């Protein structure tokens, strides 16, 4: 586990303002603050950080909720889909009153109910080659919760160009994957290859 208080310094420069913790923050996040891996320095980094979530579906909805509850200062969400009844069984950020509404609007509403101090930026559109760099550029970290390979490779390419860490997650049935790319000059998604085949 990478302690939050050792994350890259660029996370503290989100929005070009270094926000300190106030009394409300100390009460809200006291369980975080009590952990040596986070503490007050780590919580300040979370407050001054920004994360873009690509997708507000099954994986994205849970990730967005936990990020907002943890104290991420600015959250971006890009998704062009609407809430359907069949989503509600797993996409826990949405509820029955949001049926037919944009997932981005539904997610933003729920974030602000959970943590009104979070700055939320929504993009109700599909991520594509024309908007990907502009969408990603102002966020510290990108969390890819999309459900198709075209978007995944597009996000990866943009993160390489912009030197952004990429959290890559996927879920199918009872299995899931989680990886971090482009952090501290490690591999990117496109550099993963099949394991070396052993020969006799």
What residue spans do the PLM features occupy?
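N-terminal charged helix/coil linker that caps or initiates catalytic domains
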Residues: 1-52, 85
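Hydrophobic Val/Ile/Leu positions in short beta-strands of Rossmann-like dinucleotide-binding domains
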Residues: 53-56, 77
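Hydrophobic/small residue at the entry helix of a nucleotide-binding pocket
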Residues: 59
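Conserved S-adenosyl-L-methionine
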Residues: 69-74
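Glycine-rich phosphate-binding loop and adjoining beta1-alpha1-beta2 segment
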Residues: 78-115
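A structured beta-alpha segment of the ubiquitous adenosine-cofactor-binding alpha/beta core
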Residues: 100-153
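ADP-ribose/adenylate-binding Rossmann-like module
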Residues: 141-180
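Single conserved hydrophobic/aromatic residue that forms the stacking wall/gate
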Residues: 190-200
């Amino acid at each position: 586990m990478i302690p939050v208080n050792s994350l890259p310094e660029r996370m503290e420069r989100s929005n070009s303002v270094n926000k300190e913790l106030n009394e409300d923050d100390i009460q809200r996040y006291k369980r975080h603050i009590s952990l040596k891996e986070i503490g007050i320095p780590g919580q300040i980094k979370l407050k001054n950080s920004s994360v873009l979530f690509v997708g507000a579906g099954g994986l994205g909805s849970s990730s967005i909720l936990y990020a907002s509850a943890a104290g991420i200062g600015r959250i971006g969400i890009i998704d062009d889909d609407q809430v359907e009844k069949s989503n509600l069984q797993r996409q826990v950020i949405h509820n029955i009153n949001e049926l037919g509404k944009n997932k981005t609007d539904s997610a933003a509403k729920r974030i602000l109910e959970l943590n009104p101090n979070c700055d939320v930026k929504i993009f109700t559109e599909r991520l594509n080659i024309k908007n990907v760099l502009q969408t990603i550029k102002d966020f510290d970290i990108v969390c890819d919760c999309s459900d198709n390979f075209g978007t995944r490779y597009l996000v990866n390419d943009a993160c390489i160009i912009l030197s952004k860490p990429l959290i890559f997650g996927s879920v199918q049935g009872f299995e899931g994957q989680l990886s971090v790319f482009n952090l501290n000059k490690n591999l990117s998604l496109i550099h993963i290859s099949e394991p070396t085949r052993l020969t006799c």
